[in-house]
Amino acid sequence: MNRICHIEIDQASPIPPTAEIEQERQVAIFDLLEENSFALPPREGKPPVEGPFRLTLAIREGRLVFDIRSQEDEKVGEFHLSLGPFRQVVKDYFQICESYFEAVKRLPPSQIEAIDMARRGIHNEGARVLKERLEGKAEVDIDTARRLFTLICVLHWG
């Protein structure tokens, strides 16, 4: 079964996330564990490692780290992605989320909906960038990429 069965976010920041960010993290983890598609491609002529997988996401030395383990917690892979390609879309996502969180408190539903549509568009762009960066390292569907992108943003926020 090629899926993520457990996920951890290795946050090094001593500053706790805001209530909104913590809520985003919890929802993304719940949704990800409910339904996802995550597979490792074959390497060096060996057959692909089958899931389910335990995944830890971290930022170390300025790089996004995917630490992948078997369900029995044996290491099956690790790869590092440059954060450069994510910087602008993460920044844009931060800004639109701040606008959205403020809008929910004080604006009418029609204006909230417009901001939410923009937020979803930026979120989709982040998922697209992540899918591109994962090419040859891991295979994910767009919904899994969206949820992982949310967790990458949480790492930045934290």
UniProtKB/Swiss-Prot annotation:
InterPro entries per record: UCP032146
Pfam families registered for this protein in UniProt: UPF0262
Coiled-coil residues: none
Record HAMAP family: UPF0262
UniProt similarity note: Belongs to the UPF0262 family.
Protein name: UPF0262 protein Rsph17025_0594
Source species of the chain: Cereibacter sphaeroides (strain ATCC 17025 / ATH 2.4.3) (Rhodobacter sphaeroides)
